[in-house]
Every structure is written in C-alpha cells, then in structure tokens.
Amino acid sequence: DARGLWGGLLVLGKAPSSFKGDVTELQIEGIPVTETAGLYGGSDAADDSGVMQYISIRHGGAEIGEGNEINGLTLGGVGNKTVIDHIEVVANVDDGIEFFGGTVDASYLMVYGQGDDALDIDQAYSGTVDNAMVVLTAASDHGMEIDGPEGSLAGSFTVKNVTIKGASK
C-alpha cells in the first residue's frame, strides 16, 4: 500500500497532559516550533475540539526526523467534550492513532497496515478507547504502544473491546 502521500490529521486541545518539567503546554510533533498553532495541553479536561465521525484517513504520514513524525490521527491534549468515533486509518507511515495526553474518549476505531504502532498512548492520556480493531501487515511494528506520564501528572485510561490481528511475516 502507498504511504506518505500526504501528512495526517492533527487535533490539538487544551486538556491536561503530562510533560517533562511539568510545563502546561508543549509543541506537537510535526509542526515547527516557530508555529504557536502547534501548542497543546492545558487544564481544561472538558475541552471541546469538535466532532470527528465517519472519517477514513488513508496513505498519509511522514517521518520528519528522529522522534518527529506525523501520524494518521494525532490527538494532542484533546478534551472529553470532543466526539471521536468511527475513524479508520489505513497504510500510514508512522502510528495509526496517537493520544498525547488529553481526556477524549474514542470509539469504533480501525487501523490497518500502519508503519509503526496502530494505537499509541502517551503523556498521561486519561480517556477511554472502546471498540477498536487493528490489522497488522508485514509493514507494521506493533498493535499498541503505551507509555506513562512524562511529568508528575498521572493519568488513568481504559482500553476495552479491542481486537488486534497479527501479521504473517
């Protein structure tokens, strides 16, 4: 499958996230540090970044540099008033969907043939992922990557009703 034909979708909010040095905002991967529109994080757990439903994100992603990639869907500090459901990510260069902190719930997710992790959780994400399916291909690294907080803010998330089908390599 073709990959990297375009960047990806980034949604940035003002919900709590755990950063090194306990700063309240951070620049998201993939956006130059000179762009203030790339900041995410804050203290509003109920932050509302809108509604994303019935979206297919295909053949995107980019590796800009070491530790600086664009995922199919990047959620940075997105709050729990945001609606995210019925999202499909197909053949992305890096992660399918990555949660950088935040409190948003996401349901009915499908990730197919991503290059790195299908679902990636970082920076004290504190929402729920429910009803997700992951299909790994020979190009895929992992079904999930889960990292803890980077600062003192702790998070507690729930992952339920997830199916991961491995690849034959």
Can you describe what each PLM-predicted range is?
Residues D1-K169:
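Beta-strand/loop edge motif enriched in small/polar residues
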